């Protein structure tokens, strides 16, 4: 079968010649003169070639009716005839027949100069004429992608191969074929091969529709066959049975039933293929004591390394000494105590250090530090030693896979790894990856090459161009966690492939994580009830005038940005406007006093956060040399969404800052005192605010009810705490304060004084310094002075007192000024909390992300 081949003749006259032919479905041709144009029923593109300066149009498939008109400009020779053979009705293919035109006097063996410089797309039919009238064009750059799609389809079926058939032998003479340049022969073979694959075109159309994450999956399996049945094997392996371990003899404190189960699970998990796991009990359920019991339940040889936030280091040491009767020897590897030999350090049972120290010694070992003689590198003792076990407290601190702290922690050497976190997934599914990488969970935390057998736990591209292991490009590598879980969830949410990815996440977590909540274990815990209230007050007349002036000015600026469509471009300005309004709701002096410079200007510029205008707590510095509170700049970046294209709120250039960098070391307590707001205002004529007086009223009522009740007052602004401290002392309350300018020993002494001194009834705590890793069960009342749209920070603060050991009913009061931005912030906080609870770890929007719509809501009347 096949259509007849018709010759296309042209006159040999000089000058301009018009040639027109019509090739119908039966292969019949007709001639007619016309101007240059190309018409086709379905607008099929034609391949334009040039023969000795003459242009002609050659269809790659003739199953459609083609009308081709050409207006050729004559040169020395006329256009030779072209014979076209229809191949669309065959499963095979034949090359184009080119014969000599007797009218021209040229033989078919003549050397022909063919070019295809005008060819912009190659037509590749991906479906047969009988199945579809649709066709697809594939660029030159996509030709390799077509082959890869076919290979992927081959992997998908696993029972048959999709082959590209070879072109059928040409019906022309051998001399005719040889007369065509090799470059054109090669191109025609490729085009012919694709056109001849119409028998399998339906399969290729389906292959093209395979989502990118599935194509990555098939390519992974092709290069790494061991990954084919990972999830089946994981499902077959039942989660470890949880039993109760016997009470360790050296442990003074009696473990609760669920805590004994936790210790048993930790022991079994260390013996599993994962070599550890994540203990994710809700905050306040005794993760620390369960870990101490684990240390006592095994013979001790090499030391165990405990990495915790600075504020929690002394608490760990105190609990180990108290609950084990000093059966475990501990060493605090921090500050000046880092000058110790490896042999001496190995003699201790437990080594305690902070994330900041781990990052600092790792950076000095890898990158070095500048001295007069150049860059000096210093070996890290912690990274040279091999520990028996490594425990990460508040492990969500390494949730960012790209931060240097995460790299530093993953560089430690051990075979047993435990993560402790009440919130392992705070905002995004992607936060789980850093914990998996620390656990060295195989294959979930590894990077794989799609072109060879290369496999690595870390992203190793020293020159940012080629893999250090195999030499292939970054685009040829993928993370198994991303390919199997993160990408499908990001793209599809909780539907289709996204739902399957969620099931994979849950299946994995069942094998590496143990989580119990207070509600589930209420009978074991016996915790008292907790009541959460919001107290709403109104500005007085003077405060409202000042606030409205600031609010209207801020709203005018925001509306200008909104009208011009540059809200996100001015995000730093808007964030500062919101911060100023929050401060104004606390006390007008927080905003007005920020403009008064009564201390050394240069000194203050170095220690004041550029976001909140407070003394920077847990201070870190950006690449543009501006100082921020770690919490302030973290919230600032998180509120922007993905953290990309965020500008510095001070100089407005792109912000570059390491959120995990160690705190600046030159922030002494004396500097904090000198920069206090009390040194910038006249306290003799100072007047309190509505919110501070509301707090004083609540504390008076508590003291009248029971003088032994203790309270904690949380605020994000240290200047607000300074004003509260001054006012409460005037009112006769004995209180202490914890902020970011205190050393670990000073913090520990302050906490001990509050816990043991019955005369100290109020603890003023900065959210930036004491929101996590504190055990303050001596208090039963909590006052939140300034609400924030991300309620997670406040929830963690509440759990500082609602935990094991609490005997009194808990009451949490959030103070809110009704006619201010705070009322809308609370509404926004509730809306976001409902969104998180209504979805399963939604990945597209973080809990603390502040969208344009949220900003509009905050600035609405």
Swiss-Prot record:
Where is this protein found?
A: Nucleus
Query: Which SMART domains does the UniProt record give?
Result: DEXDc (SM00487), HELICc (SM00490), RING (SM00184)
Q: Where is the composition biased (Polar residues)?
A: 1-13, 60-82, 96-106
GO biological process: any one? pyrimidine dimer repair by nucleotide-excision repair
Summarize where ATP binds, as residue positions: 281-288
> Where along the chain is composition biased (Basic and acidic residues)?
14-23, 38-57
| Database matches in CDD domains | DEXDc_SHPRH-like, RING-HC_RAD16-like, SF2_C_SNF
Q: Which InterPro entries match?
A: Helicase_ATP-bd, Helicase_C-like, P-loop_NTPase, SNF2-like_sf, SNF2/RAD54-like_C, SNF2_N, SNF2_RAD54_helicase_TF, Znf_C3HC4_RING-type
What's the EC number here?
3.6.4.-
Assigned keywords, A-Z:
ATP-binding, DNA damage, DNA repair, DNA-binding, Helicase, Hydrolase, Metal-binding, Nucleotide-binding, Nucleus, Zinc, Zinc-finger
GO terms under cellular component: nucleotide-excision repair complex; nucleus
* Gene3D superfamilies assigned to the protein according to its UniProt record, in alphabetical order: P-loop containing nucleotide triphosphate hydrolases, Tandem AAA-ATPase domain, Zinc/RING finger domain, C3HC4 (zinc finger)
Locate the region Disordered. 1-217
Extent of motif DEAH box:
393-396
Q: Could you tell me where the Basic residues compositional bias lies? A: 109-123
> By its UniProt entry, which Pfam families does this protein fall under?
Helicase_C, SNF2-rel_dom, zf-C3HC4
Task: Indicate what this protein is called per its UniProt record.
Answer: ATP-dependent helicase rhp16
Lineage, top ranks? Eukaryota, Fungi, Dikarya, Ascomycota, Taphrinomycotina
Designated gene of the protein:
rhp16
């Amino acid at each position: 079968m096949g259509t007849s081949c018709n010759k296309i003749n042209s006159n040999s006259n000089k000058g301009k010649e018009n040639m027109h032919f019509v090739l119908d479905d039966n292969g019949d041709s007709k001639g007619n003169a016309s101007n240059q144009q190309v018409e086709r029923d379905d607008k099929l593109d034609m391949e334009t070639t040039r023969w000795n300066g003459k242009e002609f149009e050659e269809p790659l498939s003739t199953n459609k009716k083609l009308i081709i008109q050409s207006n050729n400009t004559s040169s020395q020779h006329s256009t030779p005839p072209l014979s076209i053979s229809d191949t669309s009705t065959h499963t095979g293919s034949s090359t184009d027949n080119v014969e000599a035109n007797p009218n021209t006097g040229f033989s078919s063996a003549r050397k022909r100069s063919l070019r295809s410089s005008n060819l912009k797309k190659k037509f590749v039919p991906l479906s047969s004429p009988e199945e579809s009238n649709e066709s697809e064009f594939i660029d030159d750059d996509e030709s390799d992608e077509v082959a890869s799609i076919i290979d992927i389809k081959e992997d998908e079926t696993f029972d048959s191969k999709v082959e590209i058939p070879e072109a059928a032998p040409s019906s022309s003479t051998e001399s005719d074929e040889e007369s065509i340049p090799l470059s054109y022969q090669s191109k025609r073979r490729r085009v012919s091969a694709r056109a001849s694959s119409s028998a399998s075109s339906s399969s290729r159309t389906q292959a093209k529709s395979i989502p990118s994450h599935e194509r990555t999956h098939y390519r992974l399996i092709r290069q790494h066959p061991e990954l084919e049945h990972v999830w089946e094997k994981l499902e077959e392996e039942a989660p470890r049975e949880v039993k109760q371990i016997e009470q360790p003899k050296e442990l003074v404190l009696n473990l609760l039933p669920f805590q004994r189960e936790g210790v048993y699970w930790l022991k079994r998990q260390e013996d599993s293929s994962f070599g550890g796991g994540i203990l994710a009990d809700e905050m306040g359920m005794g993760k620390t004591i369960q870990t101490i019991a684990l240390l006592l339940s095994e013979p001790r040889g090499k030391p165990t390394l405990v990495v915790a936030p600075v504020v929690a280091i002394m608490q760990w040491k105190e609990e180990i000494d108290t609950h084990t009767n000093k059966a475990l020897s501990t060493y605090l590897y921090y500050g000046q105590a880092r000058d110790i030999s490896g042999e001496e350090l190995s003699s201790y049972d437990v080594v305690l250090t902070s994330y900041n120290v781990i990052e600092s010694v790792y950076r000095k070992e890898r990158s070095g530090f500048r001295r007069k003689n150049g860059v000096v590198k210093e070996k890290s003792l912690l990274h040279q030693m091999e520990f028996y076990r490594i425990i990460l407290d508040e492990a969500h601190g390494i949730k960012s896979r790209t931060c240097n702290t995460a790299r530093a922690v993953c560089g430690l050497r051990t075979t047993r790894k435990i993560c402790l976190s009440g919130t392992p997934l705070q905002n995004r599914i992607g936060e789980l990856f850093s914990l998996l990488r620390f656990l060295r969970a195989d294959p979930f935390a590894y990077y794989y090459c799609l072109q060879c057998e290369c496999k690595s736990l870390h992203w190793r591209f020293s020159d940012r161009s080629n893999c250090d292991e195999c030499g292939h490009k970054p685009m040829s590598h993928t993370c198994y966690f991303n390919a199997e879980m993160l990408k499908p969830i990001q793209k599809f949410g909780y539907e289709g492939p996204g739902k399957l990815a969620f099931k994979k996440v849950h299946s994995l977590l069942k094998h590496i994580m143990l989580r119990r909540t207070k509600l589930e274990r209420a009978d074991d815990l016996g915790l008292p009830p907790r009541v959460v209230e919001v107290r709403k007050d109104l500005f007085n007349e003077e405060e409202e005038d000042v606030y409205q002036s600031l609010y209207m000015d801020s709203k005018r600026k925001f509306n200008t940005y909104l009208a011009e469509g540059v809200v996100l471009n001015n995000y730093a300005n808007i964030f500062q406007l919101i911060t100023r309004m929050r401060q104004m709701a606390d006390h007008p002096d927080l905003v007005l006093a920020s403009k008064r410079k009564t201390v050394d200007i240069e000194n203050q510029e170095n220690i004041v956060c550029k976001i909140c205008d407070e003394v920077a707590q847990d201070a870190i510095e950006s690449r543009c040399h501006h100082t921020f509170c770690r919490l302030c700049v973290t919230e600032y970046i998180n509120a922007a969404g993905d953290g990309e294209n965020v500008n510095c709120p001070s100089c407005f250039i792109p912000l570059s800052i390491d959120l995990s960098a160690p705190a600046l070391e030159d922030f002494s307590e004396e500097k904090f005192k000198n920069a206090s707001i009390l040194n910038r205002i006249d306290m003799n004529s100072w007047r309190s605010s509505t919110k501070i007086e509301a707090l004083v009223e609540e504390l008076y009522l508590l003291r009248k009810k029971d003088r032994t009740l203790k309270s904690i007052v949380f605020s994000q602004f240290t200047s607000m705490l300074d004003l509260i401290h001054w006012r409460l002392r005037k009112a006769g309350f004995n209180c202490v304060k914890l902020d970011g300018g205190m050393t670990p020993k000073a913090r520990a002494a302050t906490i001990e004084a509050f816990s043991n001194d019955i005369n100290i009834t109020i603890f003023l705590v900065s959210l930036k310094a004491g929101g996590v890793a504190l055990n303050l069960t001596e208090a039963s009342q909590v006052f939140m002075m300034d609400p924030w749209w991300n309620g997670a920070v406040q929830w963690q603060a509440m759990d500082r007192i609602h935990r094991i050991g609490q005997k009194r009913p808990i009451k949490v009061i959030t103070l809110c000024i009704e006619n201010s931005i705070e009322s809308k912030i609370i509404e926004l906080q509730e809306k976001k909390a409902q969104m998180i609870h209504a979805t399963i770890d939604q990945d597209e929007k973080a809990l603390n992300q502040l969208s344009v719509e949220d900003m509009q809501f905050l600035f609405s009347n």
